[in-house]
């Protein structure tokens, strides 16, 4: 049964069955994997968005390909493992692992085909813009001579020709390894031989040829094309009978034993095993001779349904390298983040700025430097006595790590929770942990069974004969690089209650002291799920008693069945539910009798939406100064609520509360230029401004308007709420 049939059946059920039956059955959920593929389709659609410069469109295409690679490494690998183990347990939406895999393969086939079609179109747009991708037949004599010289000096020394025969068995190919397969024949006697050339991973995929000096035209050739021109240099005495490229993806899930004496060594061993995970996808250039393809497939023990013929370019995730060409006119205009004005008002003293009033910093519109500055100032301030920090992901040469090391070397008490289980950052985190330990930092690794995903810093400072606790908590990682492109929130406060709560969270992580006396925050896996359900059910009760009831939630993924069912119940009670979900959404919006009052949108644009914001009207509707407003590191997924340490932090200060609710959330709900409306079948359609309504772009808005918790006086006439009211007045005047 294909995906269209499944959707048609589900739509028919939604039309003919009572809502009570739908609510009780698996039909009320959208399949998680198919929902993710719908999300990646939205990312891919940005590569055909004519409003984006062409190199940004190439970047979106590359991102969609990279996303798909990771999806296979983790999600598809997990489903295949279930099938191998004979597991037939159904997903919440009622599909067995085998049924899910069939639907995934069908959807991926269409997605991958569309990626290639879009790439062919983009090549034409690039050519029209003066960026030409060359085949071997396209180069001039002079260019071929230059390529040969470049090949001999910069590529040839990195290549190892690998003959395959009884004395030279088929070599190990790493995950994402790009390889040229060859059918050769010896010139002297015609004796056949198969061979491989693995493309080196640490050099650029695209080679830029010298310009002619007369115009801006950029001429580019791929590494594999250049290598193919000079295969004779690698296999002298042989001629090529057939060739083709292939690329593999391996299972990248880590298997961790529950009993371990040394967690670091355990992870080092597991990482070595992961490099040799089984092949789950083999992409093959469709021009490769069948005999050669079968030879490679058997050597890699890839099943027939794991082999994908590609009529186009392999490793599309590497297309982002093309954006390095010096053509700023073909990219987004660079954006320089603002620095919070209140910190400037205090001469850069971050502690003085926080003492004056709580502060929300909205990344990437406001600089992540203020987070780095918070820790650097703490490291150098003689009155700071202790620092505690969680690290889930950070950047190479991280200023966060340097600040913690500097603080320890200055004699301060520094504790760092380094999460070894951060997927694909495990090796980097082991390295950071050892660097920090050498500097004198007390490094802990949290729980074996739980990932610590909370974003939390705590600084204890001696002030006026007593100790003051300053905290930073946020929705994003302590990663200065991703903070330039991810939308996230950083919250700074010296509120003593939140300071005590943060200290209890750290005690929980470092000493297993379960925080039963937390006052304002909520922590998973202990109280976060309970807190969310209490608020959702509270709004349901308000609606049933005729009071205003509203829920606004912004997150990356909505998967948890219990949370979804609570939202369905709220909708049936009459609660207005507005959801902004960037990625996976297993909730079906707009189903009569089930989710009539739930609207779901997804924002895909220049920046990656990453912040989690949870707002509840509290009996007053939304927006309201009396609403309950939180930010969090947690999405609404079982893993976040039950298998991770996460923090849900309330916005208690009125200015911060207003900024998050009435500026940030309202702007996200108002966006029409980058938003997609999710439909009951799990697909989505691009939103458009209503007739007479001015289009609104949330990213452009925040790039050009200051935040409330900086100083924000200039915001009063241009806030999203004010703009909304103005538009409503104009529509009212037009209709009258």
From Swiss-Prot:
Which GO annotations describe the biological process of this protein? polyphosphate biosynthetic process
Q: Name one GO molecular function term.
A: polyphosphate kinase activity
Looking up PANTHER family in the UniProt record yields: POLYPHOSPHATE KINASE
Q: What EC number(s) has UniProt assigned to this enzyme?
A: 2.7.4.1
**According to the lineage, what is the superkingdom?**
Bacteria
Which post-translational modifications are recorded for this protein? Answer: An intermediate of this reaction is the autophosphorylated ppk in which a phosphate is covalently linked to a histidine residue through a N-P bond.
Gene that encodes it: ppk
> Which parts of the sequence are annotated with region: Disordered?
703-736
Q: What does this protein do?
A: Catalyzes the reversible transfer of the terminal phosphate of ATP to form a long-chain polyphosphate (polyP).
- Residues annotated for Mg(2+) binding in this entry: 393, 423
So where does ATP get bound? 67, 486, 582, 610
Tell me what this protein is called.
Polyphosphate kinase
Say if the entry is tagged with keyword Signal: no
Q: Which InterPro entries match?
A: PP_kinase (IPR003414), PP_kinase_C_1 (IPR041108), PP_kinase_middle (IPR024953), PP_kinase_middle_dom_sf (IPR036830), PPK_C_dom2 (IPR025200), PPK_N_dom (IPR025198), PPK_N_dom_sf (IPR036832)
- Give the family from UniProt: Belongs to the polyphosphate kinase 1 (PPK1) family.
Write the signal peptide boundaries: none
Q: Which UniProt keywords apply?
A: ATP-binding, Kinase, Magnesium, Metal-binding, Nucleotide-binding, Phosphoprotein, Transferase
What GO cellular component is one of the record's annotations? polyphosphate kinase complex
Which cofactors is this protein said to need? Answer: Mg(2+)
Question: Which Pfam families does the UniProt record give?
Answer: PP_kinase (PF02503), PP_kinase_C (PF13090), PP_kinase_C_1 (PF17941), PP_kinase_N (PF13089)
Which residues are annotated as active site? 453
């Amino acid at each position: 049964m294909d995906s269209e049939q499944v959707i048609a059946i589900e739509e028919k059920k939604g039309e003919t069955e009572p809502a009570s039956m739908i609510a009780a059955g698996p039909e009320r959920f959208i399949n998680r994997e198919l929902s993710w593929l719908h999300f990646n389709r939205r990312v891919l659609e940005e590569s055909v968005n004519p409003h984006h410069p062409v190199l940004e469109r190439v970047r979106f295409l590359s991102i969609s390909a990279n996303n798909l690679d990771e999806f296979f490494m983790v999600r598809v690998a997990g489903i295949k493992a279930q099938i191998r183990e004979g597991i037939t347990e159904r997903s919440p939406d009622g599909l067995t692992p085998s049924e899910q895999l069939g639907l995934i393969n069908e959807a991926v086939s269409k997605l991958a085909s569309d990626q290639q079609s879009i790439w062919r179109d983009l090549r034409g747009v690039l050519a029209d813009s003066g960026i030409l991708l060359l085949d071997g037949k396209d180069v001039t004599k002079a260019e071929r001579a230059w390529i040969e010289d470049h090949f001999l000096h910069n590529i040839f020394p990195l290549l190892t020709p690998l003959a395959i025969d009884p004395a030279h068995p088929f070599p190990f190919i790493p995950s994402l390894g790009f390889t040229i397969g060859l059918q050769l024949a010896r010139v002297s006697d015609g004796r056949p031989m198969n061979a491989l050339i693995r493309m080196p991973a640490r050099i650029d995929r695209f080679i830029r040829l010298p310009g002619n000096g007369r115009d801006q035209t950029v001429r580019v050739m791929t590494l594999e094309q250049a290598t193919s021109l000079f295969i004779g240099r690698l296999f002298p005495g042989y001629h090529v009978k057939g060739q083709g490229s292939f690329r593999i993806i391996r299972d990248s899930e880590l298997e961790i034993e529950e009993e371990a004496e040394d967690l670091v060594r355990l992870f080092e061993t597991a990482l070595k095993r992961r490099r040799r995970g089984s092949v789950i996808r083999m992409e093959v250039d469709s021009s490769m001779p069948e005999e050669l393809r079968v030879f490679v497939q058997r050597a890699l023990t890839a099943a027939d349904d794991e082999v994908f013929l590609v009529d186009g370019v392999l490793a599309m995730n590497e297309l982002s390298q093309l954006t390095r060409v010096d053509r700023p006119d073909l990219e987004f205009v660079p954006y320089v983040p603002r620095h919070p004005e209140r910190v400037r008002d205090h001469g850069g003293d971050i502690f003085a700025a926080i003492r004056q009033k709580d502060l929300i910093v909205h990344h990437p519109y406001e600089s992540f430097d203020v987070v780095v500055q918070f820790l650097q100032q703490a490291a150098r301030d003689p009155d700071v006595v202790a620092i505690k920090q969680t690290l889930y992901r950070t950047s190479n040469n991280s200023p966060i790590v340097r600040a913690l090391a500097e603080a320890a070397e200055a004699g301060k008490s520094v504790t760092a929770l380094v999460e070894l289980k951060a997927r694909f950052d495990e090796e980097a985190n082991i390295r950071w942990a050892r660097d920090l330990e050498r500097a004198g930092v007390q490094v802990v690794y949290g729980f074996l069974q739980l990932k610590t995903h909370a974003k939390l810093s705590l600084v204890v400072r001696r002030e006026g004969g007593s100790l003051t606790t300053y905290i930073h908590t946020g929705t994003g990682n302590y990663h200065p690089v991703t903070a330039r492109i991810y939308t996230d929130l950083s919250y700074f406060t010296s509120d003593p209650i939140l300071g005590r709560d943060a200290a209890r969270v750290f005690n929980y992580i470092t000493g297993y002291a379960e925080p039963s006396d937390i006052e304002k925050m909520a922590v998973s896996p202990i109280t976060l799920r309970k807190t969310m359900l209490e608020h959702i059910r509270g709004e349901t009760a308000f609606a049933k008693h005729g009071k205003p009831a509203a829920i606004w939630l912004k997150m990356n993924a909505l998967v948890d069945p219990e949370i979804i069912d609570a939202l369905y119940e709220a909708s049936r009670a009459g609660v207005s539910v507005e959801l902004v979900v960037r990625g996976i959404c297993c909730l079906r919006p707009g189903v009569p009798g089930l989710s009539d009052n739930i609207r779901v949108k997804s924002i895909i644009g220049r920046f990656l939406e990453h912040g989690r914001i949870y707002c509840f009207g509290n009996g007053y509707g939304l927006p309201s100064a009396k609403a309950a407003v939180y930010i969090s590191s947690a999405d609404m997924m079982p893993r976040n609520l039950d298998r991770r340490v996460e923090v849900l932090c309330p916005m208690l200060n009125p200015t911060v509360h207003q900024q998050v609710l009435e500026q940030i959330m309202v702007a996200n709900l108002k966006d029409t230029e980058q938003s997609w409306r999710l439909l009951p079948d799990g697909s989505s359609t691009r939103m458009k401004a209503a007739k007479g309504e001015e289009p609104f772009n949330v990213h452009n808005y925040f790039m050009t308007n200051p935040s409330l918790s900086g100083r924000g006086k200039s915001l009063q006439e241009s806030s999203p709420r004010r703009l909304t009211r103005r538009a409503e007045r104009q529509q009212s005047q037009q209709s009258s």
